[in-house]
Amino acid sequence: RLDGERRATFHRLYTDFFYHRHNRFWQESALRKLPVLLSATEMLTCGEDLGMIPDSVPETMHELQILSLEIQRMPKTPGELFAEPAHYPYFSVCTTSTHDMNPLRAWWEEDRELTARFYHEALGIGGDVPYFCEPWIFRRILDMHLNSPAMLTILPLQDWLSTDGELRYPDAAKERINVPSIPRYHWRYRMHLPLEELLRKETLNESLHDMIACSGRR
């Protein structure tokens, strides 16, 4: 059993190795390799900087002009339960979920307490919380994202369709794309409407066009 002084020494070694030396190592590696990849194409680059990442990642991405990924349910500011789309950086892509997350409709039904906090705090709406994520709620959420300062707003097709109660998929759970913990559950989602039918939905198309136009995006 180590005494207090030895424990503190091992803690300093551990902290330096994992949070300082490794940070510098991966940053130096990125600055050596990524510019070669970035210069090989004219594509705009986005990095998936979610979850636990080294402290050097945001600085390195900014230096290389790689857009960050911003998701309201995965805030990057300590102490925040939900990120505020109005505060997203310009050099970012904002969206409501990734392919490995539950889409909004299914997430809404997962945890009633968390949903209530999102409804009251993130959306700023009082009163009882609807059991389902209704189309009007979707429009409000998508408006928040469209009006964010982020350079790009890229939203899942499921969310766009969910702004229309008649066109959205009947089963919210089947809108999920991947479940990382289930090896065979990947890339499962299929749009339930033929493209030809979707093109004929003038009410939906005009509504989405107006939402995008009002936000100043194209």
Residue ranges and their predicted role:
Residues 1-218:
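Catalytic cores of glycan-processing enzymes that make or break glycosidic bonds
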